[in-house]
Regions:
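Soluble periplasmic/extracytoplasmic beta-strand elements of cell-envelope proteins
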Residues: 51-58, 69-71, 111-117, 132-138, ...
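Short secondary-structure boundary motifs at beta->alpha junctions and helix caps
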Residues: 76-87, 144-184, 188
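Sec-dependent bacterial lipoprotein signal peptides
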Residues: 1-24
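Surface-exposed short loop/turn segments
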Residues: 25-40, 98, 102-144
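Sec-exported extracytoplasmic/periplasmic mature domains
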Residues: 101, 105, 183-191
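A structural "domain/chain start" motif
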Residues: 24-89, 189-202
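Mid-chain, structured segments of secreted extracytoplasmic proteins
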Residues: 78-107
Length: 202
């Protein structure tokens, strides 16, 4: 009886320990899903273009990800980092494409190519950051795809706070500025007849 009780005591203690560990593991909460951001629904500040039939946006491999990227310029200006708990709803190029399609595409004939070269939150100091966007735009003819005009755009917008939401706001503002200035550029370069004729529907 005593030997059986001793055996039970050892096994029972082990079983209780396993159950206790399992119970504690069951109480551990799963990590929260990352917060997701887009560029917002800010309306365009200028009328849409009558020259553009379609927009194509491309980006390098390191920007074809929904990660919200940032850089500590004073620590290592070559290192790109990404927030763990915050991300874009889609890669920046896709978000920019959706914005430009809403603002620019209305039924013209020419095609607009946009190359995103940079899209990052930059920290020159611990308590200061900027949304940095660099873009190249090419207006191409409808028939042959020949380049009619090219222009580069660059933005460095101060973030209201030195964290992921602040970077999102600064980058969204930069895209809004780009959309407005791109529309103005298309209108300007499309004024000469040699560009407006092939771009406008007859």
């Amino acid at each position: 009886m005593t030997r059986s009780a001793n055996r039970c005591g050892g096994w029972c203690a082990w079983a209780l320990a396993v159950l206790a560990v399992a119970g504690c593991q069951g109480l551990v909460q799963a990590p929260a899903a990352p917060r997701s951001y887009d560029l917002g629904a800010t309306p365009a500040s200028v009328p849409p273009s009558a020259l553009i039939a379609g927009v194509q946006v491309s980006a390098p491999a390191w920007l074809r990800t929904p990660a919200i990227q940032y850089r500590f310029s004073q620590v290592d200006p070559r290192e790109r980092r990404a927030y763990r708990d915050h991300r874009w709803a889609a890669p920046p190029g896709e978000l920019m494409l959706a914005r430009l399609q809403r603002d620019l595409v209305v039924g013209g004939r020419c095609r607009l190519e946009v190359n995103v070269d940079e899209f990052i939150q930059e920290f020159p100091a611990a308590e200061e950051s900027f949304g940095v966007v660099a873009v190249r735009a090419t207006l191409r003819s409808a028939e042959e795809g020949a380049p009619l005009a090219r222009h580069s755009f660059a933005y460095r917008v101060p973030a209201p706070r030195p964290d992921a939401p602040g970077g999102v706001e600064a980058l969204a503002r930069a895209v809004g500025q780009f959309s407005s200035e791109l529309q103005g550029w298309v209108t300007q370069v499309g004024t000469p007849p040699e560009i407006s004729r092939p771009c406008q529907r007859q």
